[in-house]
């Protein structure tokens, strides 16, 4: 039985809010057990997660998605299914790329040992799990100076970032930090080999070596992409993306809007500052007000290489130019919140909700004031506990990549 249900016809995402049909997630595996205090900054975590509770919280998140009739695809299952369906050449290539990309860099001797260890796995799922989790000297039964022979990929539960669904295509990303760059191995593999994904157009490729991550990529409607200029995504990357989209005749977007946000390491993407939750409702952090800056790319009349043109509108005017109506702007923690309340709920990704249909969102229960403000604005909130998951610095949007949404009737 395929990880995809019978309704799935390929990547189809033309909004942030259309009814969610199919979504990619990843329950944190053994990889989070290899986070140590000395490596928190390097591995991009604010604290060590309590593994059992983190997995319990993620299961609650997935259960809420399934309760809303959403086809939930687990990343391990997708990669394992792709591996089973792939040619022997593609299987070998996956393992060789894993060995070449490994951190720490493997000696030739260790490459042989790790290759044999991986190929000895009895099931494709077991193989994928160990590739994601990291490999220790105890796994291999060898002597070495360090316990980890291959580092873990502990950020994989943030499935939003390695690639983004854009219309009927994808952008596969070059991620800012080395610890996350290895994650795109799995994105490249499934989109190159899975029968239901192999014909998906690519609008960006990690070989382009300019940083972009999925938390900065938004599809506001059929015409407009919105991309964050953030701690992880550069304006020159957006310019290259605009060029690629214009060159690809399968892509029909007419405009890209780039939005500058604070360059904070703990709030690293646009979706930690501003999100679209309904046809006219947007949630934002007031902390970003003095930093917001906007650029327009004209994909219709901007030539083969559209350039950014600074847009001097305020946030409200910019959003109105996209949705053609006055937007409702909801601040984190609600109107009249104290600076302390705004800072606390911004810190725990208070904008980072996942819309599962117009005006219905899922996110952490801990951001109580923001949840109340959304309910007061007519947004239905489906809360779940995320006290451990949030220590990885992401909320429901970060932990999900929509693969298919129904089109919105605007």
Swiss-Prot record:
Pathway: Amino-acid degradation; L-arginine degradation via ADI pathway; carbamoyl phosphate from L-arginine: step 1/2. HAMAP family: Arg_deiminase (MF_00242). Belongs to the arginine deiminase family. PANTHER family: ARGININE DEIMINASE. This is Arginine deiminase. It comes from Mycoplasmopsis arginini. It is an enzyme of class 3 (hydrolase). Gene3D superfamilies: Arginine deiminase, L-arginine/glycine Amidinotransferase, Chain A. The gene is arcA. It is found in: Cytoplasm. One of its GO terms (cellular component) is cytoplasm. GO terms for molecular function: arginine deiminase activity. GO terms for biological process: arginine catabolic process to ornithine; arginine deiminase pathway. Its EC number is 3.5.3.6. It catalyses: L-arginine + H2O = L-citrulline + NH4(+). The active site is at residue 398. Keywords: Arginine metabolism, Cytoplasm, Hydrolase. The lineage of its organism: Bacteria, Bacillati, Mycoplasmatota, Mycoplasmoidales, Metamycoplasmataceae. Signal peptide: none annotated. Homodimer.
